[in-house]
Protein backbone atom coordinates (compact mmCIF):
# COMPACT_ATOMS: atom_id res chain seq x y z
CA UNK A 1 0.00 0.00 0.00
CA UNK A 2 1.21 3.52 -0.77
CA UNK A 3 2.21 5.48 2.33
CA UNK A 4 0.13 8.41 1.09
CA UNK A 5 -2.96 6.20 1.02
CA UNK A 6 -2.15 4.66 4.41
CA UNK A 7 -1.98 8.12 6.00
CA UNK A 8 -5.61 8.80 5.03
CA UNK A 9 -6.73 7.08 8.26
CA UNK A 10 -4.90 9.62 10.46
CA UNK A 11 -6.38 13.05 11.12
CA UNK A 12 -3.44 14.93 12.63
CA UNK A 13 0.24 14.24 12.01
CA UNK A 14 3.49 15.94 11.01
CA UNK A 15 5.69 14.55 8.22
CA UNK A 16 9.41 15.03 7.80
CA UNK A 17 10.40 13.58 4.42
CA UNK A 18 8.83 12.66 1.11
CA UNK A 19 5.74 10.41 1.19
CA UNK A 20 5.20 10.24 -2.57
CA UNK A 21 6.16 6.94 -4.23
CA UNK A 22 6.75 5.29 -0.85
CA UNK A 23 5.35 1.76 -0.86
CA UNK A 24 4.58 0.05 2.46
CA UNK A 25 4.79 -3.75 2.41
CA UNK A 26 4.05 -4.40 6.10
CA UNK A 27 3.41 -2.73 9.44
CA UNK A 28 5.68 -3.64 12.34
CA UNK A 29 6.14 -2.60 15.98
CA UNK A 30 9.15 -4.89 16.50
CA UNK A 31 12.35 -3.66 14.82
CA UNK A 32 13.58 -7.26 14.52
CA UNK A 33 10.72 -8.08 12.16
CA UNK A 34 11.43 -5.17 9.81
CA UNK A 35 12.17 -6.04 6.18
CA UNK A 36 12.52 -3.86 3.10
CA UNK A 37 9.40 -1.72 2.73
CA UNK A 38 8.12 -2.08 6.31
CA UNK A 39 6.68 0.83 8.25
CA UNK A 40 7.99 0.85 11.84
CA UNK A 41 5.62 2.17 14.52
CA UNK A 42 7.45 3.18 17.72
CA UNK A 43 5.44 1.98 20.71
CA UNK A 44 6.39 2.99 24.24
CA UNK A 45 5.71 -0.07 26.40
CA UNK A 46 6.06 -0.81 30.10
CA UNK A 47 9.71 -1.89 29.81
CA UNK A 48 10.80 -1.11 26.23
CA UNK A 49 10.51 2.05 24.12
CA UNK A 50 10.35 1.51 20.36
CA UNK A 51 11.89 4.94 19.79
CA UNK A 52 15.19 3.45 20.99
CA UNK A 53 15.19 1.01 18.06
CA UNK A 54 14.72 3.34 15.10
CA UNK A 55 18.36 2.89 14.02
CA UNK A 56 17.86 -0.88 13.93
CA UNK A 57 14.57 -0.55 12.03
CA UNK A 58 16.11 1.66 9.34
CA UNK A 59 19.12 -0.64 9.08
CA UNK A 60 16.74 -3.56 8.47
CA UNK A 61 15.01 -1.72 5.63
CA UNK A 62 12.17 0.34 7.11
CA UNK A 63 10.57 2.66 4.52
CA UNK A 64 8.78 4.89 7.04
CA UNK A 65 8.87 5.57 10.78
CA UNK A 66 5.90 6.56 12.99
CA UNK A 67 6.84 8.28 16.27
CA UNK A 68 5.20 10.13 19.14
CA UNK A 69 8.23 12.30 19.87
CA UNK A 70 10.87 14.09 17.77
CA UNK A 71 13.89 12.12 16.57
CA UNK A 72 17.32 13.65 16.98
CA UNK A 73 18.65 12.92 13.49
CA UNK A 74 17.69 12.38 9.85
CA UNK A 75 17.20 8.83 8.56
CA UNK A 76 16.54 9.34 4.86
CA UNK A 77 13.01 7.92 5.16
CA UNK A 78 9.71 9.68 5.98
CA UNK A 79 9.21 10.32 9.71
CA UNK A 80 5.55 10.70 10.69
CA UNK A 81 4.98 12.13 14.16
CA UNK A 82 1.61 11.56 15.86
CA UNK A 83 0.36 12.30 19.37
CA UNK A 84 -0.17 8.66 20.36
CA UNK A 85 1.45 5.81 18.43
CA UNK A 86 -0.69 3.19 20.22
CA UNK A 87 -3.89 4.65 18.82
CA UNK A 88 -2.24 5.46 15.50
CA UNK A 89 -1.11 1.84 15.16
CA UNK A 90 -4.69 0.66 15.65
CA UNK A 91 -5.99 2.91 12.87
CA UNK A 92 -3.05 2.14 10.56
CA UNK A 93 -3.64 -1.59 11.02
CA UNK A 94 -7.36 -1.23 10.30
CA UNK A 95 -6.57 0.71 7.11
CA UNK A 96 -3.76 -1.61 6.00
CA UNK A 97 -5.94 -4.71 6.38
CA UNK A 98 -8.91 -2.97 4.71
CA UNK A 99 -11.31 -2.63 7.63
CA UNK A 100 -11.84 -6.38 8.16
CA UNK A 101 -14.62 -6.10 10.77
CA UNK A 102 -16.82 -4.37 8.19
CA UNK A 103 -17.32 -7.79 6.64
CA UNK A 104 -18.78 -9.77 9.56
CA UNK A 105 -20.68 -8.89 12.76
CA UNK A 106 -18.51 -8.61 15.87
CA UNK A 107 -19.34 -9.26 19.52
CA UNK A 108 -17.02 -7.89 22.22
CA UNK A 109 -17.20 -9.30 25.77
CA UNK A 110 -15.71 -7.38 28.70
CA UNK A 111 -15.84 -7.71 32.49
CA UNK A 112 -13.65 -8.96 35.33
CA UNK A 113 -14.86 -12.57 35.29
CA UNK A 114 -16.68 -14.77 32.80
CA UNK A 115 -15.30 -13.41 29.52
CA UNK A 116 -13.78 -16.70 28.38
CA UNK A 117 -16.83 -18.76 29.28
CA UNK A 118 -19.23 -16.35 27.56
CA UNK A 119 -17.18 -16.34 24.34
CA UNK A 120 -17.00 -20.15 24.48
CA UNK A 121 -20.78 -20.40 24.93
CA UNK A 122 -21.36 -18.00 22.04
CA UNK A 123 -19.03 -19.99 19.80
CA UNK A 124 -21.06 -23.12 20.56
CA UNK A 125 -24.35 -21.31 19.93
CA UNK A 126 -23.21 -20.06 16.52
CA UNK A 127 -21.91 -23.54 15.69
CA UNK A 128 -25.41 -24.90 16.33
CA UNK A 129 -26.77 -21.97 14.29
CA UNK A 130 -24.51 -23.16 11.44
CA UNK A 131 -22.70 -19.84 11.34
CA UNK A 132 -18.88 -20.08 11.17
CA UNK A 133 -17.36 -18.11 14.04
CA UNK A 134 -13.93 -16.71 14.77
CA UNK A 135 -13.05 -16.33 18.47
CA UNK A 136 -10.26 -14.31 20.09
CA UNK A 137 -9.93 -15.18 23.76
CA UNK A 138 -7.70 -15.82 26.75
CA UNK A 139 -7.20 -19.46 25.85
CA UNK A 140 -6.65 -19.25 22.09
CA UNK A 141 -7.70 -17.86 18.74
CA UNK A 142 -10.21 -20.19 17.12
CA UNK A 143 -11.33 -19.87 13.51
CA UNK A 144 -13.87 -22.53 12.67
CA UNK A 145 -12.16 -25.72 13.82
CA UNK A 146 -8.60 -24.29 13.65
CA UNK A 147 -6.93 -23.05 16.84
CA UNK A 148 -3.88 -20.86 17.41
CA UNK A 149 -2.05 -19.93 20.67
CA UNK A 150 -2.43 -16.47 22.18
CA UNK A 151 -0.36 -14.36 24.62
CA UNK A 152 -2.68 -11.54 25.80
CA UNK A 153 -6.43 -11.57 26.46
CA UNK A 154 -6.66 -8.97 23.70
CA UNK A 155 -3.78 -9.03 21.16
CA UNK A 156 -1.97 -5.81 20.23
CA UNK A 157 -3.71 -3.71 17.58
CA UNK A 158 -1.55 -5.03 14.77
CA UNK A 159 -2.04 -8.71 15.59
CA UNK A 160 -5.72 -8.09 16.19
CA UNK A 161 -6.42 -6.63 12.75
CA UNK A 162 -4.19 -9.26 11.13
CA UNK A 163 -6.30 -11.93 12.86
CA UNK A 164 -9.54 -10.30 11.69
CA UNK A 165 -8.07 -10.22 8.17
CA UNK A 166 -7.41 -13.98 8.35
CA UNK A 167 -10.97 -14.50 9.62
CA UNK A 168 -12.32 -12.61 6.63
CA UNK A 169 -10.18 -14.67 4.24
CA UNK A 170 -11.46 -17.87 5.87
CA UNK A 171 -15.07 -16.74 5.37
CA UNK A 172 -15.96 -16.23 9.03
CA UNK A 173 -19.58 -15.14 9.47
CA UNK A 174 -19.41 -14.08 13.12
CA UNK A 175 -16.60 -12.57 15.20
CA UNK A 176 -16.44 -13.00 18.99
CA UNK A 177 -13.71 -11.60 21.22
CA UNK A 178 -12.72 -10.96 24.80
CA UNK A 179 -11.89 -7.30 25.35
CA UNK A 180 -9.61 -6.45 28.28
CA UNK A 181 -9.52 -3.14 30.14
CA UNK A 182 -5.86 -2.75 29.13
CA UNK A 183 -6.76 -3.07 25.44
CA UNK A 184 -9.55 -0.51 25.75
CA UNK A 185 -7.41 1.96 27.70
CA UNK A 186 -4.45 1.64 25.32
CA UNK A 187 -6.59 2.01 22.21
CA UNK A 188 -5.76 -1.46 20.86
CA UNK A 189 -9.36 -1.96 19.71
CA UNK A 190 -9.72 1.40 17.97
CA UNK A 191 -11.29 0.82 14.58
CA UNK A 192 -13.01 -2.43 15.57
CA UNK A 193 -16.62 -2.21 14.43
CA UNK A 194 -18.51 -3.86 17.29
CA UNK A 195 -22.15 -4.76 16.74
CA UNK A 196 -22.72 -6.07 20.25
CA UNK A 197 -20.89 -5.25 23.49
CA UNK A 198 -21.38 -7.55 26.49
CA UNK A 199 -20.65 -6.67 30.13
CA UNK A 200 -20.33 -9.58 32.58
CA UNK A 201 -19.40 -8.02 35.95
CA UNK A 202 -16.89 -5.81 37.71
CA UNK A 203 -14.76 -6.58 40.76
CA UNK A 204 -11.22 -5.78 41.90
CA UNK A 205 -8.48 -6.71 39.43
CA UNK A 206 -5.66 -5.04 37.48
CA UNK A 207 -5.23 -2.24 40.03
CA UNK A 208 -1.51 -2.50 39.32
CA UNK A 209 -2.38 -0.80 36.01
CA UNK A 210 -5.52 1.20 36.81
CA UNK A 211 -5.40 3.92 39.46
CA UNK A 212 -8.47 2.58 41.28
CA UNK A 213 -11.72 0.67 40.70
CA UNK A 214 -13.33 3.78 39.15
CA UNK A 215 -10.54 4.02 36.57
CA UNK A 216 -10.94 0.30 35.88
CA UNK A 217 -14.68 0.81 35.29
CA UNK A 218 -13.99 3.83 33.08
CA UNK A 219 -11.78 1.66 30.87
CA UNK A 220 -14.46 -1.04 30.63
CA UNK A 221 -17.08 1.57 29.70
CA UNK A 222 -15.09 2.58 26.61
CA UNK A 223 -16.35 -0.53 24.80
CA UNK A 224 -19.91 0.73 25.19
CA UNK A 225 -19.04 4.33 24.38
CA UNK A 226 -17.49 3.15 21.09
CA UNK A 227 -20.63 1.27 20.01
CA UNK A 228 -22.03 3.00 16.96
CA UNK A 229 -18.75 4.68 16.01
CA UNK A 230 -18.23 2.18 13.19
CA UNK A 231 -18.64 2.22 9.47
CA UNK A 232 -22.34 1.45 8.98
CA UNK A 233 -24.80 3.66 10.83
CA UNK A 234 -27.71 1.59 9.49
CA UNK A 235 -26.73 -1.52 11.49
CA UNK A 236 -28.40 -1.91 14.88
CA UNK A 237 -25.99 -2.05 17.80
CA UNK A 238 -26.67 -3.58 21.20
CA UNK A 239 -25.21 -3.18 24.69
CA UNK A 240 -25.76 -6.32 26.79
CA UNK A 241 -25.48 -5.43 30.49
CA UNK A 242 -25.65 -7.44 33.72
CA UNK A 243 -28.28 -5.46 35.62
CA UNK A 244 -27.42 -7.20 38.90
CA UNK A 245 -23.96 -5.62 38.91
CA UNK A 246 -23.60 -2.32 40.77
CA UNK A 247 -21.75 -0.81 37.78
CA UNK A 248 -24.63 -1.37 35.36
CA UNK A 249 -26.09 2.14 35.72
CA UNK A 250 -22.87 3.77 34.53
CA UNK A 251 -22.51 1.42 31.56
CA UNK A 252 -26.10 2.10 30.49
CA UNK A 253 -25.26 5.80 30.42
CA UNK A 254 -22.08 5.14 28.44
CA UNK A 255 -23.85 4.15 25.24
CA UNK A 256 -26.41 5.69 22.89
CA UNK A 257 -27.28 2.27 21.45
CA UNK A 258 -29.99 -0.26 22.31
CA UNK A 259 -29.56 -1.69 25.82
CA UNK A 260 -30.49 -5.28 26.67
CA UNK A 261 -30.28 -6.10 30.37
CA UNK A 262 -30.09 -9.51 32.01
CA UNK A 263 -30.74 -10.45 35.61
CA UNK A 264 -31.32 -13.25 38.09
CA UNK A 265 -32.81 -10.93 40.72
CA UNK A 266 -35.13 -8.38 39.12
CA UNK A 267 -37.10 -7.48 36.02
CA UNK A 268 -34.85 -7.23 32.96
CA UNK A 269 -34.95 -7.89 29.23
CA UNK A 270 -33.57 -11.40 29.76
CA UNK A 271 -34.18 -13.14 33.10
CA UNK A 272 -33.35 -16.42 34.79
CA UNK A 273 -36.12 -17.76 37.02
CA UNK A 274 -36.75 -20.93 39.01
CA UNK A 275 -33.00 -21.52 39.32
CA UNK A 276 -31.90 -24.92 40.62
CA UNK A 277 -28.23 -25.51 41.47
CA UNK A 278 -27.15 -29.09 42.10
CA UNK A 279 -23.97 -31.17 42.23
CA UNK A 280 -24.65 -32.28 38.65
CA UNK A 281 -25.38 -28.92 37.05
CA UNK A 282 -27.89 -26.10 36.62
CA UNK A 283 -31.54 -25.86 35.64
CA UNK A 284 -33.42 -22.59 35.10
CA UNK A 285 -36.09 -20.93 33.00
CA UNK A 286 -34.87 -18.25 30.63
CA UNK A 287 -37.47 -15.52 30.08
CA UNK A 288 -37.06 -13.27 27.03
CA UNK A 289 -39.19 -11.01 24.80
CA UNK A 290 -39.17 -13.85 22.22
CA UNK A 291 -40.51 -16.44 24.65
CA UNK A 292 -39.32 -18.69 27.44
CA UNK A 293 -37.14 -21.82 27.44
CA UNK A 294 -35.84 -24.18 30.10
CA UNK A 295 -32.07 -24.67 30.25
CA UNK A 296 -30.61 -27.85 31.74
CA UNK A 297 -26.81 -27.48 31.83
CA UNK A 298 -23.90 -29.54 33.10
CA UNK A 299 -22.05 -26.34 34.02
CA UNK A 300 -21.86 -25.61 37.74
CA UNK A 301 -22.59 -22.63 39.94
CA UNK A 302 -24.60 -19.42 40.02
CA UNK A 303 -21.84 -17.59 38.15
CA UNK A 304 -22.50 -19.83 35.15
CA UNK A 305 -26.20 -18.91 35.19
CA UNK A 306 -25.02 -15.34 34.61
CA UNK A 307 -22.60 -16.47 31.90
CA UNK A 308 -25.38 -18.33 30.09
CA UNK A 309 -27.71 -15.32 30.38
CA UNK A 310 -25.03 -13.04 28.88
CA UNK A 311 -24.38 -15.41 25.98
CA UNK A 312 -28.11 -15.93 25.41
CA UNK A 313 -28.76 -12.18 25.36
CA UNK A 314 -26.01 -11.63 22.77
CA UNK A 315 -27.33 -14.55 20.70
CA UNK A 316 -30.89 -13.20 20.82
CA UNK A 317 -29.60 -9.80 19.68
CA UNK A 318 -27.87 -11.69 16.83
CA UNK A 319 -31.24 -13.17 15.74
CA UNK A 320 -30.45 -16.73 16.87
CA UNK A 321 -33.68 -18.70 17.58
CA UNK A 322 -34.36 -19.69 21.19
CA UNK A 323 -34.44 -23.42 20.42
CA UNK A 324 -30.92 -23.21 18.95
CA UNK A 325 -29.66 -21.40 22.06
CA UNK A 326 -31.25 -24.08 24.23
CA UNK A 327 -29.73 -26.97 22.25
CA UNK A 328 -26.26 -25.38 22.24
CA UNK A 329 -26.16 -24.58 25.96
CA UNK A 330 -27.41 -28.04 26.92
CA UNK A 331 -24.71 -29.69 24.79
CA UNK A 332 -21.79 -28.09 26.64
CA UNK A 333 -19.93 -30.32 29.09
CA UNK A 334 -17.38 -27.79 30.30
CA UNK A 335 -14.91 -25.05 29.44
CA UNK A 336 -11.16 -25.63 29.32
CA UNK A 337 -9.60 -24.72 32.68
CA UNK A 338 -12.90 -23.47 34.10
CA UNK A 339 -14.24 -25.65 36.92
CA UNK A 340 -12.53 -28.55 35.16
CA UNK A 341 -12.66 -31.87 37.04
CA UNK A 342 -9.53 -34.05 37.14
CA UNK A 343 -10.66 -37.67 37.26
CA UNK A 344 -8.18 -40.50 37.74
CA UNK A 345 -10.43 -42.95 39.58
CA UNK A 346 -9.85 -41.34 42.99
CA UNK A 347 -12.59 -41.25 45.67
CA UNK A 348 -12.20 -37.50 46.22
CA UNK A 349 -12.70 -34.60 43.79
CA UNK A 350 -10.03 -32.38 42.24
CA UNK A 351 -11.10 -29.27 40.33
CA UNK A 352 -8.90 -26.85 38.36
CA UNK A 353 -10.19 -23.32 37.80
CA UNK A 354 -8.82 -20.02 36.48
CA UNK A 355 -10.26 -18.07 39.44
CA UNK A 356 -7.62 -15.41 40.12
CA UNK A 357 -9.63 -12.54 41.60
CA UNK A 358 -11.29 -12.41 45.03
CA UNK A 359 -14.74 -12.37 43.43
CA UNK A 360 -14.16 -15.30 41.07
CA UNK A 361 -12.49 -17.34 43.83
CA UNK A 362 -15.47 -16.69 46.10
CA UNK A 363 -17.90 -17.73 43.34
CA UNK A 364 -16.12 -21.03 42.74
CA UNK A 365 -15.64 -21.86 46.43
CA UNK A 366 -19.26 -20.98 47.21
CA UNK A 367 -20.38 -23.36 44.46
CA UNK A 368 -18.15 -26.12 45.85
CA UNK A 369 -19.37 -25.57 49.42
CA UNK A 370 -22.98 -25.90 48.25
CA UNK A 371 -22.47 -29.57 47.34
CA UNK A 372 -19.39 -30.58 49.36
CA UNK A 373 -19.94 -33.63 51.58
CA UNK A 374 -16.72 -33.25 53.57
CA UNK A 375 -13.64 -31.04 53.63
CA UNK A 376 -12.73 -28.46 51.00
CA UNK A 377 -9.05 -27.76 50.27
CA UNK A 378 -7.91 -24.84 48.12
CA UNK A 379 -4.51 -24.30 46.50
CA UNK A 380 -4.09 -20.67 45.45
CA UNK A 381 -1.54 -17.90 44.96
CA UNK A 382 -1.27 -14.44 43.38
CA UNK A 383 0.62 -13.29 40.30
CA UNK A 384 3.79 -11.25 40.63
CA UNK A 385 4.13 -7.74 39.16
CA UNK A 386 0.35 -7.42 39.45
CA UNK A 387 -2.20 -5.84 41.80
CA UNK A 388 -0.79 -6.21 45.33
CA UNK A 389 -3.98 -4.96 46.99
CA UNK A 390 -5.90 -8.11 46.13
CA UNK A 391 -3.38 -10.49 47.75
CA UNK A 392 -4.73 -10.39 51.33
CA UNK A 393 -8.26 -10.47 49.91
CA UNK A 394 -7.51 -13.72 48.07
CA UNK A 395 -6.26 -15.30 51.30
CA UNK A 396 -9.28 -14.04 53.21
CA UNK A 397 -11.73 -15.49 50.67
CA UNK A 398 -9.89 -18.82 50.64
CA UNK A 399 -10.12 -19.17 54.41
CA UNK A 400 -13.74 -18.00 54.54
CA UNK A 401 -14.82 -20.99 52.47
CA UNK A 402 -12.15 -23.71 52.59
CA UNK A 403 -11.42 -25.99 55.52
CA UNK A 404 -7.71 -25.77 54.69
CA UNK A 405 -5.75 -23.54 52.29
CA UNK A 406 -2.37 -24.08 50.69
CA UNK A 407 -0.95 -20.70 49.67
CA UNK A 408 1.60 -21.17 46.91
CA UNK A 409 3.22 -19.51 43.89
CA UNK A 410 1.17 -18.52 40.85
CA UNK A 411 3.22 -16.72 38.17
CA UNK A 412 5.72 -14.85 40.39
CA UNK A 413 7.37 -13.16 37.40
CA UNK A 414 10.12 -10.82 38.66
CA UNK A 415 8.94 -10.71 42.28
CA UNK A 416 10.24 -12.87 45.11
CA UNK A 417 7.64 -15.68 45.46
CA UNK A 418 7.99 -15.67 49.25
CA UNK A 419 7.33 -11.91 49.35
CA UNK A 420 4.08 -12.41 47.42
CA UNK A 421 2.98 -15.07 49.90
CA UNK A 422 3.95 -12.78 52.78
CA UNK A 423 1.60 -10.15 51.30
CA UNK A 424 -1.19 -12.73 51.10
CA UNK A 425 -0.82 -13.81 54.73
CA UNK A 426 0.13 -10.45 56.30
CA UNK A 427 -3.31 -9.83 57.80
CA UNK A 428 -3.98 -13.41 58.97
CA UNK A 429 -3.77 -14.54 62.58
CA UNK A 430 -4.35 -17.68 64.63
CA UNK A 431 -8.12 -17.26 64.28
CA UNK A 432 -8.13 -16.81 60.50
CA UNK A 433 -8.35 -20.51 59.70
CA UNK A 434 -6.20 -23.49 58.76
CA UNK A 435 -3.52 -22.80 56.16
CA UNK A 436 0.06 -23.51 55.19
CA UNK A 437 2.52 -21.79 52.86
CA UNK A 438 4.32 -23.88 50.24
CA UNK A 439 6.35 -21.77 47.80
CA UNK A 440 6.76 -24.47 45.15
CA UNK A 441 3.42 -24.84 43.32
CA UNK A 442 3.99 -28.48 42.38
CA UNK A 443 4.64 -29.33 46.03
CA UNK A 444 1.65 -27.28 47.14
CA UNK A 445 -0.70 -29.16 44.81
CA UNK A 446 0.76 -32.50 45.91
CA UNK A 447 0.32 -31.58 49.61
CA UNK A 448 -3.36 -30.77 49.18
CA UNK A 449 -4.01 -33.95 47.22
CA UNK A 450 -2.10 -36.05 49.76
CA UNK A 451 -4.33 -34.62 52.50
CA UNK A 452 -7.61 -35.33 50.68
CA UNK A 453 -9.75 -38.22 51.92
CA UNK A 454 -12.93 -39.85 50.59
CA UNK A 455 -15.53 -37.26 49.46
CA UNK A 456 -13.18 -34.30 50.06
CA UNK A 457 -12.78 -31.66 47.34
CA UNK A 458 -9.49 -30.04 46.26
CA UNK A 459 -9.72 -26.78 44.29
CA UNK A 460 -6.56 -25.74 42.43
CA UNK A 461 -7.18 -22.09 41.57
CA UNK A 462 -5.55 -19.29 39.61
CA UNK A 463 -4.06 -20.74 36.44
CA UNK A 464 -6.77 -22.89 34.87
CA UNK A 465 -5.96 -23.48 31.20
CA UNK A 466 -2.40 -22.10 31.41
CA UNK A 467 0.34 -24.51 30.39
CA UNK A 468 3.22 -22.50 31.83
CA UNK A 469 4.55 -20.81 34.95
CA UNK A 470 6.38 -17.49 34.62
CA UNK A 471 9.39 -17.19 36.92
CA UNK A 472 11.56 -14.16 36.29
CA UNK A 473 11.23 -13.48 32.58
CA UNK A 474 11.10 -17.17 31.65
CA UNK A 475 8.09 -19.35 30.89
CA UNK A 476 8.46 -22.89 32.19
CA UNK A 477 6.19 -25.79 31.20
CA UNK A 478 3.61 -26.14 33.95
CA UNK A 479 0.01 -27.32 33.76
CA UNK A 480 -2.03 -27.59 36.97
CA UNK A 481 -4.06 -30.40 35.41
CA UNK A 482 -1.02 -32.54 34.60
CA UNK A 483 0.55 -31.85 38.00
CA UNK A 484 -2.71 -32.84 39.70
CA UNK A 485 -3.00 -36.06 37.68
CA UNK A 486 0.55 -37.05 38.60
CA UNK A 487 -0.06 -36.27 42.28
CA UNK A 488 -3.24 -38.37 42.28
CA UNK A 489 -1.41 -41.30 40.67
CA UNK A 490 1.52 -41.04 43.10
CA UNK A 491 -0.87 -41.01 46.05
CA UNK A 492 -2.54 -44.17 44.76
CA UNK A 493 0.72 -46.09 44.41
Swiss-Prot record:
Which coarse location class applies to the principal site listed for this UniProt protein?
Answer: cytoplasm
BP-aspect Gene Ontology terms: cell division; cell wall organization; peptidoglycan biosynthetic process; regulation of cell shape
Q: Where does ATP bind?
A: 111-117
For this protein, the Enzyme Commission number is: 6.3.2.13
Entry comment on modification after translation: Carboxylation is probably crucial for Mg(2+) binding and, consequently, for the gamma-phosphate positioning of ATP.
The top EC class, named as a word, is ligase
Q: Which Gene3D superfamilies match?
A: Mur ligase, C-terminal domain (3.90.190.20), Mur-like, catalytic domain (3.40.1190.10), MurE/MurF, N-terminal domain (3.40.1390.10)
Localization terms from the record: Cytoplasm
Q: Which residues carry this modification: N6-carboxylysine?
A: 220
Q: Which InterPro entries match?
A: Mur-like_cat_sf (IPR036565), Mur_ligase_C (IPR004101), Mur_ligase_C_dom_sf (IPR036615), Mur_ligase_cen (IPR013221), Mur_ligase_N (IPR000713), MurE/MurF_N (IPR035911), UDP-N-AcMur-Glu-dNH2Pim_ligase (IPR005761)
**PANTHER family named in the record:** MUR LIGASE FAMILY MEMBER (PTHR23135), UDP-N-ACETYLMURAMOYL-L-ALANYL-D-GLUTAMATE--2,6-DIAMINOPIMELATE LIGASE MURE HOMOLOG, CHLOROPLASTIC (PTHR23135:SF4)
What is the annotated role of this protein in its UniProt record? Catalyzes the addition of meso-diaminopimelic acid to the nucleotide precursor UDP-N-acetylmuramoyl-L-alanyl-D-glutamate (UMAG) in the biosynthesis of bacterial cell-wall peptidoglycan.
| Protein name (record) | UDP-N-acetylmuramoyl-L-alanyl-D-glutamate--2,6-diaminopimelate ligase
The primary gene name is murE1
Amino acid sequence: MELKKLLECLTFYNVNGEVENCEITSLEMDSRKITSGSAFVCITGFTVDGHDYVDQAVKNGASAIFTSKPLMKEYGVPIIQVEDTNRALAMLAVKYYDYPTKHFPLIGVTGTNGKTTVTYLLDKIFEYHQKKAGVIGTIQVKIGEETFPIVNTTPNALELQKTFHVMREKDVKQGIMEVSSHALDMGRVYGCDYDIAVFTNLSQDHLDYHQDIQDYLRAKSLLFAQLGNGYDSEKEKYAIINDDDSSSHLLKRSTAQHVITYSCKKEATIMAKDIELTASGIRFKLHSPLGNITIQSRLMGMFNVYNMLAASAAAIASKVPLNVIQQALESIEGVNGRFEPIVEGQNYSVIVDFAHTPDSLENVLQTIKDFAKRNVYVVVGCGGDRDRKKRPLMAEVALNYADHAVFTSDNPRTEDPQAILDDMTAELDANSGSYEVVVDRKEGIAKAIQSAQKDDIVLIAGKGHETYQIIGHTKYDFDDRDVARNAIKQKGE
